[in-house]
Regions:
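Cell-wall glycan-active module
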Residues: 1-222, 226, 231, 236-310
Length: 310
């Protein structure tokens, strides 16, 4: 079936040189480079790729450890005494992302559907996910492919994968209150190893996809933690849910047909059903992003285009 054809594991390495150089691999990358080689991922592109990336960034792992550390150890705010509570009611939280469900954005979605009709026809026919849902998800994720992330996906994941000890993110660790205590150092070390192993799996999946799709690893944009493409898949999701929407034998999430087919395949495999209630459909969308406002916005934007959720 065209929609679920996966890229061959024996795909050729990219024939382009991209922005690679042929210098020496910086020492900070060598453990990661050797690990990839030991896991059977060596190739003529690998040395040049690592030689072209400078040194690892502290930011991806540093941001994540700071987030986890703050959640685990920051003092909890004291409850407000009844006598000092404000008398005016708090402003309710928005149910949808502000500024998304507008007449202008509805027209952008409709124009995108018209311009890519065959891709949405195929995805809807194959996976049963309405085109208004698919285009609304693409709009929320990447504004229909116009904003694909500010980071470089391969460099981000490689930096995280290579950051296994606190010294690798020393600038961030120094800013964490109490981080010099032995038990906190042990906590940081353990979390870094866990996140490094996670990033390594994503990096391996991304490298395989880059080799099959022919994308330039150094130029590929991504989110702050390595999600890629119009539909913002983490690389390991490509192997599970990536779909070849244009029949060229590879999954390239930077093409509209593959991105639309892949996100529709994802929703279908997570239980999308035409007969489901609106609440059940919202639950399926939340497997893509777990917060209510995300699912509410996608459903609301789809309904503004004429989709009836139940």
């Amino acid at each position: 079936v065209r929609a679920i054809r996966r890229a061959s594991a024996a795909a050729q390495y990219p024939s382009y040189q991209g922005s690679y150089t042929n210098g020496a691999i910086p020492s900070a990358w060598l453990p990661l480079y050797q690990r990839l080689r030991a896991d059977g991922l060596d190739g003529p592109d690998l040395p040049a790729l690592f030689a072209s990336m400078g040194t690892p960034s502290q930011d991806p792992m540093g941001r994540k450890i700071k987030e986890l550390y703050t959640k685990a150890f920051a003092p909890k705010p004291k409850p407000t005494p009844p006598s000092s509570k404000p008398t005016t009611p708090a402003r309710p939280k928005p149910l949808v992302y502000p500024g998304v469900i507008t007449a202008e954005n509805v027209e952008k979605c409709r124009a995108f559907l018209e311009a890519n009709k065959s891709a949405f026809d195929y995805a809807e026919r194959t996976f049963g996910v309405p085109r208004q849902i698919s285009v609304s998800l693409l709009f929320v994720e990447t504004r229909l492919g116009t904003f694909l992330g500010k980071e470089k996906a391969f460099y981000t994941l490689a930096s995280m994968a290579s950051s296994r000890r606190p010294e690798a993110i020393s600038t961030y660790v120094a800013q964490l209150p109490g981080s010099t205590a032995a038990d906190r150092q042990s906590w940081i070390q353990q979390r870094m190893e866990q996140r490094s192993d996670w990033a390594y799996k994503e990096l391996v999946a991304l490298l395989k996809n880059i080799r099959s799709s022919g994308e330039d690893a150094l130029a590929m944009p991504g989110s702050i933690y390595g999600a890629i493409g119009l539909c913002q898949f983490m690389p390991t999701n490509i192997g599970h849910y990536g779909a070849d929407g244009n029949g060229d034998g590879v999954v390239n999430l930077f093409t509209v047909p593959d991105a639309v087919a892949s996100l529709a395949n994802y929703l279908a495999q997570h239980g999308w059903n035409k007969a489901a209630t609106r609440a059940q459909k919202q639950k399926v969308i939340k497997t893509y992003n777990r917060i209510d406002i995300y699912a509410n916005t996608i459903l609301g934007l789809a309904e503004a285009q004429g989709y009836v959720a139940e």
